[in-house]
Design a protein with these regions (language model features):
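Amide-forming acyltransferase catalytic core, primarily the GNAT-like/NAT-type
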Residues: 21, 25-26, 32-48, 58, ...
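A short beta-loop-alpha structural element at the N-terminal edge
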Residues: 6-21
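Catalytic micro-motifs at enzyme active sites that drive phosphoryl/nucleotidyl and oxygen chemistry
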Residues: 44-45, 71-77, 109
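Conserved beta-strand in the GNAT
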Residues: 54-56, 62-72, 85, 90, ...
Length: 295
């Protein structure tokens, strides 16, 4: 008799469960070799904001469907609030088309609400954006800006409006984020602040992960552990992906990357888990590569 499938909360996030998730991910995405046990352990179990919220579809001793979101803390409409970053959604090819994506995600959100999660954010490619909007009622806040150029991107010291959303980085979660297995980070600094750069996998091109103003002294001890890039000129080509109204683009050698060259994901998504029906303003929402697990 064929084994039935069951949807279950991840449980204890045991080694056995992580290994089954890794097997599923590499079955569906065989080229995504960064999905190692060490990476999932770091992502799901070591986050100082809390362990991942996850649900699985089990078939016997195998996981054939998986959804995961990790806890984050953000400044949302002027107040600090706990929420989720939606990261991994995968269903084995033999079990696709059965509604597992929607049921796994909604089960995860309901569970997270019990722990005071007030929102979910995500960054999705064009293929994934529409199901998130239709089935999970996400707001498509904005396509991310993608630019390629040279040098530092300067920020305005006094932006025209306060951000309606930005992820809150403190010593503990920044230290954890910088320990992403397999990552290659560098820093450069000047009088206005510190830039964090991540390797893109393309020789000679680094991506700006985030920028920290000089006033963020509480993070300096964490950033000082990252190797300094000898000079900004030693790796001149830079990739910028995100949303940030503080960026002063005029006068800098950055150009918008044509659509056919853009890396995925590209759309910033938001879902309110409260009853207040909140939506983000794309003109003041901020998100950087550091805020989601791209590099």
């Amino acid at each position: 008799m064929a084994l039935a499938t069951t949807i279950e909360k991840f449980g204890s996030l045991s080694d056995h469960e992580l290994l089954r998730v890794k097997e599923l991910m590499l079955t569906v995405w065989p080229k995504a070799t960064f999905y190692t046990f060490e990476y999932l352990d770091w992502l799901y179990r070591l986050n100082p904001a809390g362990k991942a919220e996850t649900f699985n579809v089990w078939k016997g001793n195998s996981i054939v469907g998986h959804y995961a979101a990790i806890p984050i803390v953000a400044n949302l409409f002027g107040h600090e609030e706990r929420g989720l970053l939606s990261l991994n959604s995968v269903v084995h090819p033999d079990y696709q088309g059965r509604g597992y994506f929607k049921s796994l995600a909604l089960s995860t959100y309901e569970e997270a609400k019990l722990r005071n999660a007030g929102f979910v954010i995500g960054v999705a490619n064009a293929k994934s954006t529409l199901p998130c909007q239709r089935q999970l009622k996400f707001q498509k806040v904005s396509p991310l800006t993608v630019k390629l150029g040279f040098g530092h991107v300067k920020r305005k010291t006094e932006p025209s409006a306060s951000p309606c959303f930005n992820v809150k980085w403190e010593e503990a979660n920044l230290d954890w984020r910088l320990k992403r297995p397999g990552a290659n980070y560098r820093v450069t600094s000047n009088s206005s602040g510190t830039w964090l750069w991540g390797g893109t996998g393309t020789h000679g091109i680094y991506a700006e992960m985030g920028w920290f103003p000089t006033e963020a002294r509480q993070l300096s001890s964490v950033l000082s552990q990252v190797d300094a890039m000898s000079t900004i000129k030693s790796n001149p080509v830079k990739l910028w992906i995100g949303l940030d109204q503080r960026c002063e683009w005029p006068g800098y050698w950055y150009c918008v990357l044509p659509e056919r060259f853009k890396p995925s994901p590209l759309n910033f998504l938001f879902k309110d888990l409260t009853n207040f029906k909140r939506f983000l303003d794309p003109e003041t929402a901020q998100i950087s590569l550091l805020d989601f697990d791209a590099y």
